[in-house]
UniProtKB/Swiss-Prot annotation:
GO biological process: glutamine catabolic process; pyridoxal phosphate biosynthetic process; pyridoxine metabolic process
Protein name (database record): Pyridoxal 5'-phosphate synthase subunit PdxT
Pathway(s) it belongs to: Cofactor biosynthesis; pyridoxal 5'-phosphate biosynthesis
UniProt family annotation: Belongs to the glutaminase PdxT/SNO family.
Organism: Geobacillus kaustophilus (strain HTA426)
PANTHER family: PYRIDOXAL 5'-PHOSPHATE SYNTHASE SUBUNIT SNO (PTHR31559), PYRIDOXAL 5'-PHOSPHATE SYNTHASE SUBUNIT SNO1-RELATED (PTHR31559:SF0)
Catalytic activity annotation: aldehydo-D-ribose 5-phosphate + D-glyceraldehyde 3-phosphate + L-glutamine = pyridoxal 5'-phosphate + L-glutamate + phosphate + 3 H2O + H(+); L-glutamine + H2O = L-glutamate + NH4(+)
Record-linked SUPFAM superfamilies: Class I glutamine amidotransferase-like (SSF52317)
InterPro entries to which the protein is assigned, alphabetical: Class_I_gatase-like, PdxT/SNO, PdxT/SNO_CS
Record-annotated active site: C78, H169, E171
CDD domains: GATase1_PB
Assigned GO CC terms: cytosol; glutaminase complex
Source domain of life: Bacteria
Lineage: Bacteria, Bacillati, Bacillota, Bacilli, Bacillales
Gene, per the UniProt record: pdxT
The enzyme's E.C. designation: 4.3.3.6, 3.5.1.2
Length: 196
């Protein structure tokens, strides 16, 4: 199983380490052609407006949308969650606009207010330590969205079909259960496409 990590900004190496720890192959993606042959893609944290500029500069916007249209799973963490959202509070336009969610940027405060919180994640388990850094949260989730975790009544992890998103940085701890959950999604998608 080959999983790409969008390598424009953010905790790229940590995601690679998590993917490899789960027994899959990780590929850092910086060019559209590097999406070929991948089974799934991780959109890491960073700064969403900077990431958007880099996506545009490297001509990745359409190829990323095509990757999603082909039914390939995508996992967005922190800024990656913002890239996946159809609606962003205070912005007219989304980025990739793939998940039926509304997100608010930096909604837990700025960098100095980074914190860790123990989460219970549906389908993953309890006692998962979420590392929140300038984190967004999901203000509103559409009907087809499965809420996986909340913190202080705010949605911090959700899934819609082939898309998985979370507010926190799962790659910054050694608990790889959420990455394993994503790899299981990828496995299911591969099986489904081979049956077509």
């Amino acid at each position: 199983m080959k999983i790409g990590v969008l390598g424009l900004q953010g905790a790229v190496r940590e995601h690679v380490r998590a993917i490899e720890a789960c027994g899959a192959e990780a590929v850092i993606v910086k060019k559209p052609e590097q999406l070929e042959g991948l089974d799934g893609l991780v959109l890491p944290g960073g700064e969403s407006t900077t990431m958007r500029r880099l996506i545009d500069r490297y001509g990745l916007m359409e190829p990323l949308k095509q990757f999603a249209a082909a039914g390939k799973p995508m996992f967005g963490t922190c800024a990656g969650l913002i890239l996946l959202a159809k609606r962003i509070v205070g912005y007219d336009e989304p980025h990739l606009g793939l998940m039926d969610i509304t997100v608010e940027r930096n909604s837990f405060g700025r960098q100095r207010e980074s914190f860790e919180a123990e989460l219970s994640i549906k389908g993953v388990g309890d006692g998962f330590v979420g590392v929140f850094i300038r984190a967004p949260h999901i203000v509103e989730a559409g009907d087809g969205v499965d809420v996986l975790a909340t913190y202080n009544d705010r949605i911090v992890a959700a899934r819609q079909g082939q898309f998985l998103g979370c507010s926190f940085h799962p790659e910054l701890t050694d608990d790889h259960r959420l990455m394993q959950y994503f790899l299981n999604m990828v496995k299911e998608a591969k099986m489904a496409s081979s049956l077509k």
